[in-house]
Amino acid sequence: MNFEYNEKTQALLEKLKAFMNEEVYPIEKEYIHAVENGSANNGEGRWKTPEMMHTLKKRAKEAGLWNLFLPEEYKPYGAGLTNAEYAPLCEEMGRVLFSSEIFNCSAPDTGNMEVLAKYGNESQKKQWLEPLLNGEIRSAFAMTEPAVASSDATNIETSIKRDGDEYVINGRKWYTSGAMNENCKIMVVMGKTDFDAPRHQQQSQIL
């Protein structure tokens, strides 16, 4: 079997490595220090994104290293890479704790954008997906609950019930990824809409 990267992946990987060497590694300690300082003083600046992140995002977008995670089926969104093509880029980004955010490839935004790209209607895509793809907003994902082993999502107990033109969400979540980000504007919440359905068909997600 041939395990070499194809030309597209190799070109992106070389560009990514150059960006990491020129832009990310030199400021790694400074960025972490800025985050730690923000968490001091009773945590008042804990969730404030350091200004250098915004600068790096702009440079990554200009370099064509943006939204690398969405596969071919979601074009024109993303780079149209397969998982095998995206994997070595993840490996490179993973060398620095915060670098995936620079390229708009960090959770929970990646998963939420994929959900919106696949299942969202045109109104939802315009309101939420496009600003996420542009890096204008951040998002959150709420699945984990304190009373159950939530890594198995069939255990979750939060209910989502239709009430006229609205939905009522009743439950308790914690470890909600992205919820405290200062730019979080949309949350994807997992709950159960049919407790009597087969075990793996009870759940829904709501914006």
Question: What residue spans do the PLM features occupy?
Answer:
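N-terminal glycine-rich flavin-associated loop
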Residues: F103-S123, D152
